Curated annotation (Swiss-Prot):
Highest rank taxon of the organism: Bacteria
Gene: infC
Listed Pfam families: IF3_C, IF3_N
Alphabetized InterPro entries for the sequence: T_IF-3_C_sf, T_IF-3_N_sf, Translation_initiation_fac3_CS, Translation_initiation_fac_3, Translation_initiation_fac_3_C, Translation_initiation_fac_3_N
Record GO cellular component, one term: cytosol
Lineage: Bacteria, Pseudomonadati, Pseudomonadota, Gammaproteobacteria, Enterobacterales
Matching HAMAP family: IF_3
Keyword Cytoplasm: yes
Role played: IF-3 binds to the 30S ribosomal subunit and shifts the equilibrium between 70S ribosomes and their 50S and 30S subunits in favor of the free subunits, thus enhancing the availability of 30S subunits on which protein synthesis initiation begins.
GO molecular function: ribosome binding; translation initiation factor activity
GO biological process, one term: ribosome disassembly
Protein name (Swiss-Prot/TrEMBL): Translation initiation factor IF-3
PROSITE patterns xrefs: IF3
Record family assignment: Belongs to the IF-3 family.
Amino acid sequence: MKGGKRVQPARPNRINREIRANEVRLTGVEGEQLGIVSLNEALEKAEEAGVDLVEISPNAEPPVCRIMDYGKFLYEKSKATKEQKKKQKVIQVKEIKFRPGTDDGDYQVKLRNLIRFLEDGDKAKITLRFRGREMAHQQIGIEVLNRVRDDLSELAVVESFPSKIEGRQMIMVLAPKKKQ
């Protein structure tokens, strides 16, 4: 769509003349309580200070307004949100594939990778895939999964252990143990 009107996104807080109440509970620039005043008086005080009158909680009776620099307020708010997002860790599920006949050397390499994933705080999905005649020896597959579970018992807790085979594979999910 070319040349369309660009709509200003709605502000989360009403400021200055957008405030509809007749009386407001006013808070000063430093956070001090200034009591309940008329809207015009609050606007005058904000203008004297050279900043905006921002409606903080519109549902209160009367609405709570604060004298502050709205641009700075939005900046601080967005900065705090970014900081929170930075602190959140996205848990990923890493997958390692085994076969019933996985030899000891390969097993150790895969186990090292599983340990690294769990230490990084990620979940690990162990897929045991059967081919051809291996389907007749499902017990070997369960033994492999039990061995993995026992080897990682210090680091991980089993989230789901396969009770039966799904198609041609068994899937076990491990989650890292919480650190004390």
